[in-house]
């Protein structure tokens, strides 16, 4: 239901007019929101930042993968690939930081 509402709000279309790529992009956002909402605040800005950024970056990766599946524009496809590469690297860096500080994701 929430995905359908977001679709209506953001593009003014209903049900059958929503294509597969749009549905997958919205699903990536929904997954991110659930993951971010499950992060308990610690009161430590660095920790909270990293724990929230990891699902945010993962959503960017998931959306970029959707772009590679459905997108046609070469410039947007290159951008999607760069996003995947950069965001994966940054997730690894953040996970390493959490590990070095003996914190969990």
Regions found by a protein language model. Give the residues of each.
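His/Met- and acidic-residue-enriched segments that coordinate or traffic transition-metal cofactors
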Residues: 2-5, 11-105
């Amino acid at each position: 239901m929430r995905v359908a509402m977001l679709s209506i709000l953001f593009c003014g279309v209903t049900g059958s007019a929503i294509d597969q790529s749009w549905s997958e992009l919205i699903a990536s956002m929904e997954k991110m929101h659930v993951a971010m909402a499950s992060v308990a605040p610690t009161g430590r800005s660095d920790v909270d930042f990293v724990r929230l950024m990891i699902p945010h970056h993962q959503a960017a990766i998931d959306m970029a993968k959707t772009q590679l599946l459905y997108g046609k524009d070469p410039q947007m496809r290159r951008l999607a690939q760069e996003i995947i590469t950069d965001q994966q690297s940054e997730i690894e860096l953040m996970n390493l930081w959490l590990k070095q500080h003996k914190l969990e994701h």
